[in-house]
Amino acid sequence: MSSLAPWRTTSWSPLGSPPSLEDALRLARTTRAFAVRRDGEGRALVTYLYGTPELFSLPGARELRGIVYREEDGTVLSRPFHKFFNFGEPLAPGEEAFKAFRDSMVPLFVAEKVDGYLAQAYLDGGELRFASRHSLNPPLVGALLRKAVDEEAMARLGKLLAAEGGRWTALLEVVDPEAPVMVPYQEPGVYLLALRSIGEGHYLLPGVHFPLPEALRYVRWEPRMDFDPHRFRGEIRDLQGVEGYVVTDGAEFVKFKTGWAFRLARFLMDPEGVFLEAYAEDRLDDLVGALAGREDLLRAVARAQDYLAGLYGEAVGAGDALRRMGLPRKEAWARVQEEAGRWGGFAPAYARAAMAAYEGGEAREAFLVELRKRSARKALEALHLFPRVGGELRG
């Protein structure tokens, strides 16, 4: 196995020795941005909880992305992906880095990004073990791995690592149709993304640096001799159902995301808030377009839309009926309040629309005013209409 040339003109390199356990624990003690997870068996995992350009500029910080140590002697057992960025972000390689490759005619390698849950496989005392970015015993990723990987694939993975003396980490992405992130997959699967040298930090790509492993799925890395980041970003911008692509030289990585992925990511961060904003501004058609390919989310949007339509219809019907009855306002308000209680957190929206209809005013606008409030987002969240991204943090 041999590595590619390291990325040029970048201010930081993932090559070289990993941060020591002492340095990792020091960072965890001095900032709340890092956490230490222990498994009770002598292993410690250090990872970031959130990050900023300033934080990731600290020495060793980009390596603390789920790195696993043996606490007794500080040995690094597993070295996962370092933190890397989208093209255009402050710490990502810029145009000058790509130009250096074009000028020297050294290839870069491009692969479609697998959109699942990142996992790492490593050997400890000859035993194959798995971890996620946040846990040595990941409940979600562990369950998905057991579901997607058969014994033959597990054995092949163990042999692949053992053949290299156990000083490599296998970097994996786990996907499952029952736990989608953004891109929907038809069946469970585990994809081998790369191997990483624990001691030296460089990466080996399947099909580029070592033969494609039998019984294992893998990403396909395609060489590009004349890679232009701006042209490439334009090529993929309008792709639907694809999160994006990753470009590497075997040391540094850069992400290129599609417009669809950025829009969907915004929705997944706050589905209730984004839905209510689109509903109140009559932009549901745009939202539906942004969710193309995610039938589960489209069904959730339809359910939420039907729920609000039913709520509004009942409120206006009640207000109109009270007006026709000729009830005084105080009595009408009392009846509206009694009925509104059935709608839980949406009671204010019901009451305001009903009273606007009772008074012959703009019931729709009154209804939308309430939907723009934070309390409406909480009320919609309580209905559990929108599926959540899997129960573990990602990053």
Swiss-Prot record:
Keyword annotations from UniProtKB, A to Z: ATP-binding, Ligase, Magnesium, Metal-binding, Nucleotide-binding
Stated name of the protein: RNA ligase 1
Reaction(s) catalysed (UniProt annotation): ATP + (ribonucleotide)n-3'-hydroxyl + 5'-phospho-(ribonucleotide)m = (ribonucleotide)n+m + AMP + diphosphate
pH dependence, entry free text: Optimum pH is between 7.5 and 8.0.
CC cofactor: Mg(2+); Mn(2+)
Gene Ontology MF annotations: ATP binding; ligase activity; metal ion binding
UniProt-annotated binding residues for ATP: Y48, R65, K83, E173, K255, K257
Pfam families, alphabetized: RNA_lig_T4_1
Superkingdom in the source lineage: Viruses
Keyword Glycosyltransferase: no
Catalytic residues identified in the record: K113
Use in biotech settings: The thermostable RNA ligase could be of potential use in various applications including nucleotide labeling, oligonucleotide synthesis, gene synthesis, gene amplification and amplification of mRNA and synthesis of cDNA. These methods of use have been described in Patent WO2004027056.
Binding site for Mg(2+): D285
Cofactor, how bound (note): Optimum activity is reached at 5-10 mM for both Mg(2+) and Mn(2+), with Mn(2+) showing slightly higher activity than Mg(2+).
Site (Essential for RNA ligase activity): E173
Role summary: RNA ligase that ligates single-stranded nucleic acids in an ATP-dependent manner. Catalyzes both inter- and intra-molecular single-stranded DNA (ssDNA) ligation to >50% completion in a matter of hours at an elevated temperature, although favoring intra-molecular ligation on RNA and single-stranded DNA substrates. Is able to catalyze the adenylation reaction of ssDNA 3'-terminal phosphate (ssDNA 3'p) to 3'-adenylated DNA (ssDNA 3'pp5'A). Does not have significant 3'-adenylation activity with a 3'-phosphorylated nicked dsDNA substrate.
Enzyme Commission numbers on file: 6.5.1.3
Temperature dependence comment: Optimum temperature is between 65 and 70 degrees Celsius.
Lineage: Viruses
